[in-house]
């Protein structure tokens, strides 16, 4: 039985004071949650205090990016070791916004995945297709490429520690929505690709999150699908009460 992992992605929102306030509320709200792993992805400037606030709770902290070197002359970058040293548990990688705005390639994302695993943290690898891919019938082709190139050369053991987050980029901010059944169909295809790479036993243990505008109103229907093992939540994670409603749907 796979355990649900529900992660919030705060993106470039919240200063340190706001982050501390929201996490304090979330920690209090979720103290009795037993069946869901809770993660918050916060901006770099908030991470150190975020880790301290949630210590001893069932909330873990994720970084939203990393550079795939332990140290060096890489001005402006943050290394996996720096994140690990302050107590970060997860790192969100390959998000559609980073692929779009910063032109991150699957090869570069794969380097980050390996660097995060090597230091003992858990990667959340984001994959997803655009509207033109969806309408052109290329969904599986695009996702399979992102998975195969993003997770190339991983051992089965490391694959099991890796979370895959499916973001239907075509459904974010376009007014188009994926039904729970459509999301399930794609998640099943993703698991089949993972099974090709790592074997069915490993694929059946891997967490596949849904990242297509999960909200309190649709969370229960999405999380009840067989191959949806949690969510990567954007806007609805910015307020503790709305994020908690999603967590309750999974719990």
UniProtKB/Swiss-Prot annotation:
One Gene Ontology term of the molecular function aspect: triose-phosphate isomerase activity
Principal location listed in the UniProt entry: cytoplasm
Protein name: Triosephosphate isomerase
Family according to the record: Belongs to the triosephosphate isomerase family.
Pathway listed: Carbohydrate biosynthesis; gluconeogenesis; Carbohydrate degradation; glycolysis; D-glyceraldehyde 3-phosphate from glycerone phosphate: step 1/1
EC number of this enzyme: 5.3.1.1
A GO cellular component annotation in the UniProt record: cytosol
UniProt function note: Involved in the gluconeogenesis. Catalyzes stereospecifically the conversion of dihydroxyacetone phosphate (DHAP) to D-glyceraldehyde-3-phosphate (G3P).
UniProt subunit comment: Homodimer.
Active-site residue numbers: 95, 167
Keywords, comma-separated and alphabetical: Cytoplasm, Gluconeogenesis, Glycolysis, Isomerase
Pfam families, alphabetized: TIM (PF00121)
A GO BP entry: glycolytic process
Domain of life: Bacteria
Residues that, per the record, bind substrate: 9-11, 173, 213, 234-235
Organism (species): Fusobacterium nucleatum subsp. nucleatum (strain ATCC 25586 / DSM 15643 / BCRC 10681 / CIP 101130 / JCM 8532 / KCTC 2640 / LMG 13131 / VPI 4355)
InterPro entries: Aldolase_TIM, TIM_sf, TrioseP_Isoase_bac/euk, Triosephosphate_isomerase, Triosephosphate_isomerase_AS
Compartments where found: Cytoplasm
Membrane-spanning segments: none
SUPFAM superfamilies: Triosephosphate isomerase (TIM) (SSF51351)
Catalyzed reactions: D-glyceraldehyde 3-phosphate = dihydroxyacetone phosphate
């Amino acid at each position: 039985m796979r355990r649900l992992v529900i992660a919030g992605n705060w993106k470039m929102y919240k200063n340190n004071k706001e982050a501390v306030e929201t996490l304090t509320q979330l920690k209090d709200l979720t103290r009795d949650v037993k069946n869901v792993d809770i993660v918050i992805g916060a901006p770099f400037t908030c991470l150190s205090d975020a880790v301290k606030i949630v210590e001893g709770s069932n909330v873990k902290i994720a970084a939203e990016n990393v550079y795939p070197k332990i140290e060096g002359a890489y001005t402006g970058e943050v290394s996996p070791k720096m994140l690990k040293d302050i107590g970060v548990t997860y790192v969100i990688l390959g998000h559609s916004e980073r692929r779009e705005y910063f032109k991150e390639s699957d090869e570069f994302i794969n380097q980050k995945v390996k660097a995060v695993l090597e230091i003992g943290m858990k990667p959340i690898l984001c994959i997803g297709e655009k509207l033109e891919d969806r309408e052109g019938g290329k969904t599986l082709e695009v996702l399979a490429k992102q998975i195969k190139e993003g997770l190339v050369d991983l051992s089965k053991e490391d694959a099991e520690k890796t979370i895959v987050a499916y973001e239907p980029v075509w459904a974010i901010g376009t007014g188009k929505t994926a039904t729970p059944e459509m999301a399930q169909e794609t998640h099943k295809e993703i698991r089949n690709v993972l099974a090709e790479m790592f074997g069915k036993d490993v694929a059946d243990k891997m967490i596949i999150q849904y990242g297509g505008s999960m909200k309190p109103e649709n969370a229960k229907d999405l999380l009840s699908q067989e191959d949806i093992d949690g969510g990567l939540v954007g806007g609805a994670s910015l307020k503790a009460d709305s994020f908690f409603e999603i967590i309750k749907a999974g719990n």
